[in-house]
């Protein structure tokens, strides 16, 4: 279900932001629209961020969940306060849903 996957992605992004805030580390998000994946890294060295309960820092989305547009690009930085450097949008299935990342608050939500 597309809504369940959107909620899963929101939860993962929020968990990564909060985890890095607690660890006093920067967090980086990369979105690959061609592969329909997103990748989490952290620290200035951009080490893989494997969240508790996850086996990888790369998340591959199911075939019905297509990232059709994203201005996140490579290594969107969230500072140690969880604030992204810019407001960004991830579009799912050509305007079916969008995930918004708001600067400077770090608020992450879906429409």
PLM features: residue spans?
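N-terminal helix-rich module
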Residues: 1-14, 18, 22, 26-111
């Amino acid at each position: 279900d597309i809504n369940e996957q959107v909620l899963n992605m929101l939860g993962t992004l929020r968990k990564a932001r909060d985890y890095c805030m607690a660890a006093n580390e920067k967090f980086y998000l990369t979105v690959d629209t061609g592969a329909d994946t997103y990748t989490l890294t952290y620290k200035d060295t951009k080490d893989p961020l494997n969240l508790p309960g996850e086996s990888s820092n790369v998340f591959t989305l199911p075939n019905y969940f297509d990232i059709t547009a994203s201005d996140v690009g490579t290594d969107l930085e969230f500072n140690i306060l969880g604030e992204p450097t810019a407001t960004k949008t991830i579009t799912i299935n050509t305007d079916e849903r969008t995930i918004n990342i708001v600067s400077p608050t770090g608020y992450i939500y879906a429409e």
